[in-house]
Amino acid sequence: MKKIFKKTSALFVAASMTLALAACAGGGSGTEKTGGEGQAEGGSDAGEEITLTIWHQSVSDTDPVKKIIEDSVEEYHKLHPNITIEQDGVTGEQYKTKIKTAFAAGEAPDISYMFSGGSFVKPYIDAGYLLPIDEYLSEETKSKVLPGMLDGCTFDGKVYTLPTVTFLANLYCNTEMFDKAGAKIPTTWDELLEAIEKLNDAGMTPIMMGEKDRWPGMYWYDIVSARTAGNKGLEEAFGDPSKFNSEPFIKAAEKMQELVNAKAFNENMMSMSYDEMVEGFAAGQGAMLFQANWVHPSIQADTSATKGKVTCVSFPVIEGMAGSETEFSGGSSDGYYINVNCEHPEEAVEYLSYLSEKIGRDGYQQGAGLPCWNTEDVDTSGLSVLDTESAALMETGTSYITWWDNIFPAEDSETYKDLVAQLMALKITPEEFAESMSKLSPSEFY
């Protein structure tokens, strides 16, 4: 497997921040505290009583990581009876607000879930709030991580976290709807437009879009411009934004509006949320969805109307342009970081290593993402068709670039998402879009 993950994918470890912090803060109403007696065979001898706190955002019952974290808390206490882990979960924007407030108030936990990329985690690192963990990492742990996967965990030459799982954005197609419409799963842009026309003629919504949250539309421009400019062209523009005001990026903006004018998306796309978009696709309300493989649990749930009816493919190529079907949007996932003021950094890093590997191995087995850790001894016979298809696509990858809001500085990330929303609402022209993009700040990663 080729792994050319950009440093911006700082472990999907997605957007911004400030101030002072302290060590061990408790959870709130959702806090779980584990106890119990005894220790597992091979566990460590009990020593000083230690409590570590961890905040995460895996709270949905459809998120396999929720149970993985809960299990890790119980298992780790059995292995280390003197160590108690208190975990608290909040999701989405609420989590971003909570963690930002906690750091500002000096009430951050020992271990924090962080979104990937420079627009979220890097300001915490620059402010000195997070602990470099190099000196605490064993060679054994590092040897279990797949080649290249620590790159996204490294800032300014220092490792700050460990990978868990990695994600890949795919085009999801409801084969039942395609068959009913007499449409072909697209491999080129022209075939995509033909499929959209046939699906519309059959009275079906071609593509589900939830642009109320802005980032789903951003994913579309991310990949369309990768097909027009190629990932190398994207990297050049991240380093020199003036290049956004050039033919490949204007062409990508034109392609986005071509989709809108072709009635590719649901009419209420600007008022539909991400959750509603995924739920709608799982309910069979749209024939296509472009998203990362974290949508698999929703599509494959027993309650899903599309279970067993969906295939995932690489986004169609645009003939005559620089991009190829082996260039992907994706990268290693968000991760967990240690508070620099943690009173027990060695124990915190040991638990971080345990948790990260467990999410990587168990999460892969349960469809939570693709592996960042050695999984040769993991039974993958239970993987779904979608998980297998997505893993096979990743095997073909020659280049990966993470979501753009992880690449730009925080304010510019918001500007970019706003511009894509305006583009899709037909409020600005492709030329105006490109001109505005050219005024963004260069990414420090390129």
Describe the role of every protein-language-model region.
Residues 10, 24-120, 126, 139, ...:
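Conserved N-terminal structural module of periplasmic/extracytoplasmic solute-binding proteins
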Residues 154, 369-378, 388-446:
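C-terminal capping/gating helix-and-loop segments adjacent to ligand/active sites or protein-protein/ligand interfaces
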Residues 196-198, 238-269:
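Glycine-centered hinge/linker elements that transmit conformational signals in sensory
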Residues 116-170, 193, 219-222, 231, ...:
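Hinge/lid segment of periplasmic solute-binding proteins
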Residues 74, 93-130, 142-161, 170-172, ...:
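Pocket-flanking alpha-helical
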